């Protein structure tokens, strides 16, 4: 049995591919490795793929026992700090169960160097989404994950080309890029940069009747930007907002759009765990270090 663990913005999702469960990040502060018996007896778990925060401290899929500082440069940065993800990671590591840590995409990643104009491109769970989607749609794919924040990735010939991170381009419902007003509030000492990021989504910046339309427009723009680099790529949407924005994104892009549910990342991570622990040396262009 192989398990994928999605460290999402609002919840932790656990999947074996056949069974799954989720807990809030607050509930995750009480997690123990024994909770995995909801998916499988512990002695039948052959491998786990774990995500933690931004994953910017490692460039490769790495044995959890070899990862320092949970695979991050710092816990500071853009996002909520609750403690649930830390608890899950530490419990898995202490359990002795075979596990690998999935990296995020950053300047140390083997992506198109032009994307490295920004320090960070995507957090680790997005790799799970891309892996799951590529199984269905092939080796040339654009995937936009639209929920609390919006992140879009491009796969070309089976290798990750690059991604637009949550704080760079399209807003999500809660989080987004910092605009001039946000920068001014920060400079006046009225807000931290992280708090500004956490309140830059459409739920904070747009009237209710324009929120879905706005997210759809920006999601389509991110996808269109990626299609400049790979015009023949298939397009998919994931995340909690995917069903709501899909019709408009399809209309704006004039192409078919495949929609995935909230379990896409965890299922893809379970698939990564299976492939890594059965001998894969490369996942979407990311090396595997055992």
Predicted regions and their residues:
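N-terminal glycine/serine-rich phosphate-binding loop of ATP-dependent small-molecule kinases
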Residues: 1-65, 94-95
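Glycine-rich phosphate-binding loops at beta-strand->alpha-helix junctions
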Residues: 231-249
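Gly/Thr-rich phosphate-binding beta-strand-loop-beta motif of the actin/hexokinase/Hsp70
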Residues: 1-21, 138-163
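Glycine-rich phosphate-binding loop plus the immediately following alpha-helix
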Residues: 110-140, 157-207
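Short beta-strand-loop/turn "lid" adjacent to the catalytic site in phosphate-handling enzymes
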Residues: 43-118
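Adenine-nucleotide phosphate-binding core of ATP-dependent small-molecule kinases
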Residues: 190-235
